[in-house]
C-alpha cells in the first residue's frame, strides 16, 4: 500500500511540473510576442503633411468585443475613442482622426494631419477591454515622430467643417515673417482672382486667412504658399467643408411632359450633409408616388412617369431635407401635359437626282391638337453642315440646288415642340455616280496575323463589310465577314510568317453589293525560328519576344483566363517593347468553331472581366495593343476558353450526392444486420455454455457423494 501511494505522488508531481513548464513557455512566448508587437518605430514627416500611426488590436480568442483606444504623446493623453465617441486634446483638435475600415491599418490606427513642428515626440497606442477581466492584453505600439526642420511654415492650416454663414479661419503662421510672403489659393486659383471671395476674405500679417461670412460656394481646397527672400517655397493645404440646409437652387416655372411617353420631373437642389428625404406636393397636397400608379421615385428624388397622361398635370413643389433640415420648398412648378408632334408629310426613303439638279425634301408636322405648328429643323446625319449657299427652307421643306457629289448622304427632319422631338430620315443619291468603295486601306502585322483598316466610302444604314484576302501565290480568295457594322477594321489570323497577302474590302447594304476597294498588299513579319517548330514559337510568343512592328509597339503576352463568380477574368502582361506608345487594349472574343465574333471591348488596364458567356461553348479570346500615333494594333496569342455546362456539373453533383447517400444507407443497413446476427449467435453460445456448466456441476456432486459413502463404510469396518 505505501508503494502504491508513493507511485501516485510521483505521477502527480510529474504532471504538476509539466503544467508549470507549459505555463512558463506560454508566458515567454506571450512576452516575446508583446515585445515584438510593441516595438518602436521611427517616422519622419514634413510640416503640413500627414502621417498614419498604425495600431492593431489583439482580441481575446480573435472575437471582436468592445474596446477602448488611448493615444498618448510624451506620456500625455491626446486622443480617446470608445463606442464611436472621441475625445481629442486642444492641440490636436481637427488634426487627429481614427482610421476606419482600411485594409492596411489596424482598428486603433490614427491619422495626424497638418503636422507642426511641435508634433515631434513619442506616441504610444494602448487598447483595453472594459467589459473583460483582465482588461489589458498585449496591445500597444510606440512611434517616434521626427518633424523635418528648415521649413518656412510654423503652423500649417487644418481641415475645417463649419456651417454656412460662420467664419472660416486657416492658420499659416510663417516662421520668419520679416523676410517671407504668404499667398492663398482656392482650388488652384489665386484668391484675388475669385470674384465671390474678393470682398469676404482677409489675410493677417502672419499669413493666416479668414473668410467671413462663408457661403456654400466656398467649399473646396485652400493652399497656402510661403516664399522667402531667397526664393525658397513651402506649401500647405487644407479643405474647407461648408455645411448647410438642403435648398432648392433652381425650379422652372413650367415643365412640359409628352403625353403617352415616359418623362422625368426633376428637383434641382443642393445639400451638405447629403439628402435624406425629398417631399413632393401636387396642388397643395402630399404627392406620394407609392399611391399613384405608374409614378416612381428615382435615386436622386426625381419623379419618373412611366406613361404620362392628363391626370399628371398640375402644380408641383419639392422640399429637400438633410440632417440640418430644409431651406424651404421650391417655387411652384406648373406641369403641362402636351401631346408630341406628328408628321403630316414625311420625306421618301430615297431620292435619286442628277448632278446640277435641285432636290426637294418635304417635311411637315403638327401638334396632335392641331393648334400649334412644331419647329422643323433639317440636318445631315453624319454631322456635316448643309451647303450654306445652295439650300433653302420653305416651311418644313428642304431644297438643295446645284447638286454635287458631296451632297449625297442621309438627311434628317426633326420636328420639335415643348413636349418631345420626332425625326424622319431620307437618303439622297446622285445618279450616274457609283457609291464610293472603301478607301485608304492601312495595316499592321505580326508573324501570323494582319490587321487591316479602311475608311468608309459613304455612310448608309445597315452597311456591312467583308474582307477578301489571299496569299499572293494562291489562286483562290478567302473571305472574312465583319459582323459589327460600326467597326472599320478586321484581323485576319492563322497566316504564314514572312508571306505577302493581298486584300480587298467589299461594302454591302440592303440594296445589294457595293464596290470593292483597291487591292492592297501587306506582308506578315518573318519568323526568327522554323515554321514547323510550333512549341518554340509559342513559347517565344508567350514570353513577349514578338518582333515589334514598324512603330515599335510590342504585343501583349502571357494571356490567361481565370473563372470566377462573374464569369472569366482575363489577364495579360504589358508589351515588352514600345510601352510608352501604348494607348489602350482592345479585347475580342469569338465563338468556335464557327469563328463568330461575339463582342469586343476597350480597356486601359491589363485585365478584363468577361461576363455572360454561354455554357458548354468554346470561345477564342485575343488582346490587341493599340498605339497612340500610328493607330497600329498588335495582337497577342489566341486563348481558348471552354465554358463548362453548369447544368451538367449540378447534375453530376446531385447524382454523386445521391450515390454517396445510398452507399451510406446500404452500409448502415449491412452493419445493423451483421450486428443483429452476431448478437443472436452470442446469445446461443452463452446458453449452451450455461447448460454444460450445469451438467458438469451435477457430475461433480454425484462423485463427491460416492466418495463420502465409501469413506463411511471404511470407518464402520475399522470400528
From Swiss-Prot:
It is a single-pass membrane protein. Residues 688-704 have a biased composition (Acidic residues). The chain crosses the membrane at residues 651-671. Residues 1-33 form the signal peptide. GO terms for cellular component: axon; plasma membrane. Interacts with tutl. This is Protein borderless. It comes from Drosophila melanogaster. The gene is bdl.
Amino acid at each position: 500500500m505505501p508503494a502504491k501511494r508513493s507511485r501516485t505522488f510521483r505521477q502527480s508531481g510529474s504532471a504538476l511540473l509539466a503544467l508549470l513548464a507549459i505555463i512558463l513557455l506560454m508566458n515567454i512566448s506571450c512576452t516575446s510576442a508583446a515585445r515584438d508587437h510593441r516595438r518602436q518605430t521611427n517616422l519622419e514627416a514634413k510640416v503640413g503633411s500627414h502621417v498614419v500611426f498604425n495600431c492593431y488590436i489583439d482580441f481575446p480568442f480573435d472575437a471582436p468585443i468592445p474596446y477602448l483606444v488611448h493615444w498618448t504623446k510624451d506620456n500625455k493623453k491626446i486622443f480617446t475613442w470608445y463606442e464611436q465617441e472621441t475625445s481629442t486634446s486642444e492641440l490636436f483638435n481637427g488634426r487627429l482622426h481614427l482610421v476606419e475600415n482600411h485594409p492596411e491599418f489596424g482598428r486603433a490606427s490614427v491619422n495626424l494631419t497638418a503636422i507642426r513642428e511641435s508634433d515631434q515626440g513619442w506616441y504610444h497606442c494602448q487598447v483595453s477591454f472594459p467589459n473583460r477581466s483582465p482588461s489589458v492584453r498585449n496591445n500597444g505600439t510606440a512611434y517616434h515622430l521626427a518633424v523635418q526642420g528648415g521649413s518656412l511654415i510654423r503652423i500649417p492650416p487644418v481641415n475645417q467643417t463649419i456651417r454656412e454663414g460662420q467664419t472660416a479661419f486657416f492658420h499659416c503662421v510663417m516662421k520668419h515673417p520679416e523676410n517671407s510672403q504668404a499667398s492663398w489659393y482656392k482650388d488652384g486659383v489665386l484668391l484675388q482672382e475669385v470674384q465671390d471671395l474678393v470682398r469676404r476674405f482677409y489675410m493677417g500679417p502672419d499669413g493666416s486667412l479668414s473668410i467671413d461670412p462663408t457661403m456654400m460656394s466656398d467649399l473646396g481646397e485652400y493652399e497656402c504658399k510661403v516664399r522667402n527672400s531667397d526664393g525658397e517655397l513651402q506649401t500647405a493645404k487644407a479643405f474647407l467643408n461648408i455645411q448647410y440646409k438642403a435648398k432648392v437652387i433652381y425650379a422652372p416655372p413650367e415643365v412640359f411632359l409628352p403625353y403617352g411617353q415616359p418623362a422625368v420631373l426633376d428637383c434641382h437642389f443642393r445639400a451638405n450633409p447629403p439628402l435624406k428625404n425629398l417631399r413632393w406636393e401636387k396642388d397643395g397636397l402630399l404627392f406620394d408616388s407609392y399611391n399613384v400608379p405608374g409614378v416612381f421615385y428615382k435615386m436622386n428624388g426625381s419623379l419618373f412617369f412611366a406613361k404620362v397622361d392628363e391626370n399628371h398635370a398640375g402644380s408641383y413643389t419639392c422640399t429637400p431635407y438633410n440632417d440640418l433640415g430644409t431651406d424651404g420648398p421650391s417655387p411652384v412648378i406648373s406641369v403641362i401635359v402636351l401631346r408630341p408632334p406628328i408628321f403630316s408629310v414625311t420625306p421618301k426613303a430615297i431620292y435619286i437626282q442628277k448632278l446640277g439638279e435641285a432636290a426637294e425634301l418635304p417635311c411637315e408636322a403638327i401638334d396632335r391638337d392641331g393648334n400649334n405648328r412644331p419647329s422643323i429643323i433639317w440636318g445631315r446625319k453624319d454631322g456635316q453642315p448643309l451647303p450654306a449657299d445652295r439650300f433653302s427652307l420653305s416651311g418644313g421643306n428642304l431644297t438643295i440646288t446645284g447638286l454635287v457629289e458631296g451632297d449625297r448622304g442621309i438627311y434628317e427632319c426633326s420636328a420639335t415642340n415643348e413636349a418631345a422631338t420626332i425625326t424622319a430620315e431620307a437618303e439622297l443619291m446622285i445618279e450616274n455616280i457609283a457609291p464610293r468603295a472603301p478607301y485608304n486601306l492601312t495595316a499592321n502585322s505580326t508573324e501570323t496575323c494582319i490587321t487591316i483598316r479602311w475608311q468608309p466610302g459613304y455612310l448608309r444604314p445597315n452597311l456591312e463589310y467583308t474582307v477578301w484576302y489571299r496569299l499572293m501565290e494562291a489562286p483562290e480568295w478567302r473571305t472574312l465577314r465583319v459582323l459589327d457594322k460600326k467597326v472599320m477594321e478586321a484581323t485576319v489570323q492563322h497566316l504564314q510568317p514572312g508571306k505577302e497577302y493581298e486584300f480587298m474590302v467589299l461594302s454591302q447594304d440592303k440594296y445589294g453589293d457595293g464596290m470593292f476597294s483597291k487591292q492592297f498588299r501587306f506582308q506578315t513579319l518573318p519568323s526568327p525560328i522554323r515554321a514547323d517548330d510550333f512549341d518554340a514559337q509559342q513559347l517565344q510568343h508567350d514570353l513577349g519576344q514578338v518582333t515589334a512592328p514598324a512603330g515599335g509597339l510590342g504585343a501583349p503576352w502571357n494571356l490567361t483566363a481565370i473563372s470566377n463568380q462573374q464569369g472569366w477574368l482575363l489577364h495579360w502582361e504589358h508589351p515588352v517593347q514600345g510601352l510608352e506608345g501604348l494607348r489602350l487594349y482592345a479585347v475580342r472574343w469569338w465563338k468556335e468553331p464557327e469563328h463568330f465574333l461575339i463582342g469586343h471591348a476597350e480597356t486601359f488596364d491589363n485585365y478584363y472581366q468577361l461576363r455572360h458567356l454561354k455554357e458548354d461553348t468554346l470561345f477564342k479570346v485575343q488582346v490587341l495593343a493599340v498605339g497612340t500615333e500610328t493607330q497600329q494594333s498588335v495582337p497577342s496569342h489566341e486563348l481558348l476558353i471552354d465554358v463548362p455546362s453548369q447544368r451538367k456539373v449540378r447534375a453530376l453533383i446531385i447524382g454523386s450526392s445521391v450515390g454517396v447517400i445510398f452507399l451510406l444507407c446500404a452500409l448502415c443497413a449491412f452493419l445493423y444486420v451483421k450486428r443483429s446476427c452476431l448478437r443472436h449467435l452470442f446469445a446461443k453460445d452463452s446458453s449452451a455454455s450455461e447448460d454444460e456448466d450445469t451438467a458438469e456441476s451435477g457430475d461433480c456432486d454425484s462423485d463427491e457423494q460416492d466418495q463420502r459413502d465409501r469413506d463411511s463404510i471404511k470407518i464402520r469396518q475399522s470400528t
